[in-house]
Amino acid sequence: MKQGLSQKELAFISKLELREKYFFVRDDIRSNFASDNEMNVYIHRLKKKGRVIKLNKSKYFLVPIKAVGQKWSEYPFILIDEIMNGEDYWIAGKAAAHYWKLIDQIPFEFLVFTPKKYGVMKIFNIRINFKRKRKKNFPKIVERKIRGHKFIIASKKESLQWK
């Protein structure tokens, strides 16, 4: 059984979509609710309905209303940057080699080195493997943009090892 959206859920989803703010924090929607408890209830309901996905402790992703059957995909590099809050990470492995056109194979897994977190995360059928590495051991990295959003990736020279 499919659940629809309530009037209040639809109101703040529409506000976020009008501002094209698909990645949001709790402060972005706080004005729509009387209390933090009410906000937590609505976020929980939307997570159950598949309209909101929690990326990290404070950041969420809003699946747009225009997504058919609640199926949506986002650029993996943008997703990784948002999960890591834009700092202390670099994308490596087959994903970096594919980005630099060193290999033709589309990567199954996105390898991300960071001093903060580790483990495997799966969002939108994208498998992200976080591995720990000290910041002093980071190789030469490059900042690039995709759809106006910056992300950090291993340099072309560093990506040759995953060719």
Where are these predicted regions, by residue range?
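A general, composition-driven signal for non-globular sequence regions
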Residues: 48, 88, 139-141
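Short, intrinsically disordered/low-complexity patches at protein termini
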Residues: 48-49, 77-79, 94, 129-131, ...
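Short amphipathic alpha-helical surface micro-motifs
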Residues: 4-7, 41-44, 72-73, 91-95, ...
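Helix N-cap / beta->alpha transition motif
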Residues: 25, 92, 153-157
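Phosphate-handling catalytic interfaces
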Residues: 98-163
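Short beta-edge/loop segments at beta->alpha junctions of small alpha/beta modules
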Residues: 2-86, 123
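Generic detection of long, well-ordered alpha-helical segments
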Residues: 33-36, 86-90, 158-163
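Active-site nucleotide-donor binding segment shared across nucleotidyl transfer reactions
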Residues: 51-68, 88-114
